[in-house]
Amino acid sequence: MKIACISLGCPKNQVDLDVMVHILLSAGHETVADLAEADVILVNTCGFIESAKTEAIENILEACSYKQQNPELKVIVTGCLAERSRSQIEEEIPEVDAVVGCASNKAIDTIVARLFHGEDHLESYGAKKDFPLGGKRVIGTPAHYAYLKIAEGCNNRCHYCAIPGIRGPLHSRDMADCVAEARWLAGEGVKELIVVAQDPTAYGEDWGKPGSICELLDKLNKVPGLEWIRIMYAYPERITDEFIAAMKRNEKVVPYLDLPIQHCNDTILKNMNRRSNRAELLEVIGKLRREIPGITLRTTLIAGFPGETEEQFEDLCNFVKEVKFDRLGCFAYSAEENTVAAKMDGQIDQETKDKRAELVMQIQTGIMAQKQAEKVGQTVHVLCDGIDEESGLYLCRTTGDAPEVDGNVCVSSEEPLYPGQFYDVLVDDSDLYDLYGTVAK
């Protein structure tokens, strides 16, 4: 059968899809890029917030529309929305042939076989503890970087977040399995390994071994062929001295940390069920910058959380001005079904939430413009991702730029640059998100 895939959501979801595609290829199926050619369309969904749910439903409907020209087409919905909203999908989009929960990804080949043996409207859900945690898979990213998912689920229980209800409690992947996959990825040509989980810093806590991320970094650092190791979604509550020391002693671990703090006001943080206060956040950020000079810090904020007053929002704005994060995204609070925050008093109207998020981003725009301008005249070490055909510029990244979420270094070069290769670039211009330059002589 010809399988076409629509991939939505975060890198963790991409890894799940990579595993499913490997299973399908191993069963003798083939993948196609054109939805019109497919016998099966696999829609791997995100369902984290309302906007992601809307996008997922739009893509499901698009996939189902191809049944008009191919009545035998099968549409399978997987991922977080399948786990979270199975009844809604089945009731409102009856054209969907199967809804497969996250814990049943490893049964995807069986689902396809059953559909083509005459069964329809299938659903499959496994126990949360049985979530597949990687293993053999295809590499759905460009060949020179890949995501390594080291855990599934989360025990943090933030009051705004639906993930524990979708992905279950923390389930750390066997360390030897993580290292084995990293070795395989390096053997396939991967130069940059991006470590992901709902909370990588909690890795091993379900074994009774908090801080296991440090040991894992030590082992990953020894994998031949890897050049950069990047950590995403690190929670500030677990940025210990030991963790910082592990980042420092392992030269392949890049000076970059995605640190989602969500807010800075003590009352709001408590209502969010976060475990840091403003003073502790400032202490962690200051320590990271002192101990790892030049570190790039990215964060995520929520504006308009239930009960957020004008004074508390102003506190957030002042915090952003004070800390000057290198990368920042701010989102209007989204009330998610089956979360504590959705039932709280003091829900804020959408217009106010949107305005607050926009104001935070306006503040960050000024900070970013200054930080970008300061890099003009510097020589930076970059990894080439490829060429932009329209401009003819090569798109590269520094250690401070994670793929897809951060900016690029756009390089002009008469000589060809090659994806997966490293270069030194002299920066001669900047804009809000990107740098521009030429290969240093």
What are the residue ranges of the model-derived segments?
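Radical SAM enzyme [4Fe-4S]-AdoMet core and its adjacent flexible, acidic
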Residues: 10, 203-225, 272, 335-366
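Proteins enriched for Cys/Gly/acidic motifs involved in redox and nucleic-acid/cofactor modification
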Residues: 1-203, 242, 257, 279-290, ...
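Short, hinge-like loop/turn segments at secondary-structure boundaries
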Residues: 93-94, 116-118, 211-213, 247-248, ...
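Terminal RNA-binding accessory module
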Residues: 343-441
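Conserved, mostly hydrophobic/aromatic
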Residues: 178, 195, 231, 259, ...
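Conserved SAM/AdoMet-binding glycine-rich loop
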Residues: 75-79, 84, 89, 187-311, ...
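Active-site proximal loops enriched in glycine and acidic residues that flank catalytic Cys/His/Asp
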Residues: 197, 233, 261-263, 299-303, ...
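Short acidic/polar active-site loop segments enriched in Thr and Asp
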Residues: 97, 191, 227, 326, ...
